[in-house]
Amino acid sequence: MPNKHLEHPEDSILQGRRVAIDAIKELVTVTKLSVKWDGAPAIVFGTNPENGKFFVGTKSVFNKRRIKINYTHEDIDQNHQGTVADILRLALDNLPRINRIIQADWIGVGGGNVYCPNTIKYRFPSTINQQIILAPHTSYVSIHPDSRGHFGVNLANTEDCYFIDTTQAQVKTWSAPKLVAETLALLPFAGKVCEKCSLQDIRKHVNSAIRCGDKLEASALLESFYAKYDKYNCGVNLNTFKVWVNISKLKLRLLENIETTDNVECFIDGKPTALSLIHISEPTRLLSIAYAVFCL
């Protein structure tokens, strides 16, 4: 599937026990990660294999309806407005004509060394002299609603475009056997999501709790969920949310053991932070940050 949003490991339990087992295995065995930069908007660009033409666009290039693929400035004028249109014009003028399809996060226009495209502020060690700055992270072989994305993209800089290396993260040796065993023991008793309650409903509920800074405990998540939805028809139970919380803890343990090799400083609310410097002193805030930066 196109990388329209990041799938979070803890959400795997909402897709079934087998998917959750695969996510747990990935968390405890992964050695290399792709760092998700906090850029906006997402830019998709490359050569369309169907006609051989270079294009730029947003994630709307993967739409099932109202597909917005831009080959010219006129296409951009027709499909987009405002800041997004301005960014796409810069992208069309300055991106290299490559024979691949790449998704990247927009960081900004060159000429400076401090950028805050979204929540996280980035300080580069020196001024970026290229025209535009992007953080490429996913590649595709086609433009289709069901295109499969592949992480691990590293593009060479050009005269006009500065590409951030999003592959500069490795995992130190770590383990959490007790937490893994506890989570696996809960899986057979975790309720399955039924047809009367969509995955999107549960994701919205959990994301709302994270944004509000609520304490992420299984019982509290379940109680507030039952207050909104019919508990007899939603399928999920206390063990579902216990597994969700445990997998999120595993993810945070992994985040604690990530080492990056870049030299870009990161700031949130004016305070220095980085993957290797995030601690669990504020677990809810950390989980929000983890949602922003974590890719297997």
Located regions from the model:
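Residue-level detector of alpha-helical segments with a strong bias toward transmembrane helices
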Residues: 48-49, 292
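Long, charge-rich alpha-helical interaction segments
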Residues: 185-258
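Short beta-strand scaffold segments in enzyme catalytic cores
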Residues: 42-46, 134
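Single conserved hydrophobic/aromatic residue that forms the stacking wall/gate
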Residues: 278-296
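Covalent nucleotidyltransferase
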Residues: 53-216
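Active-site-proximal "nucleotidyltransferase
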Residues: 1-41, 49, 53-112, 227-234, ...
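C-terminal structured domain segments
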Residues: 268-277, 281
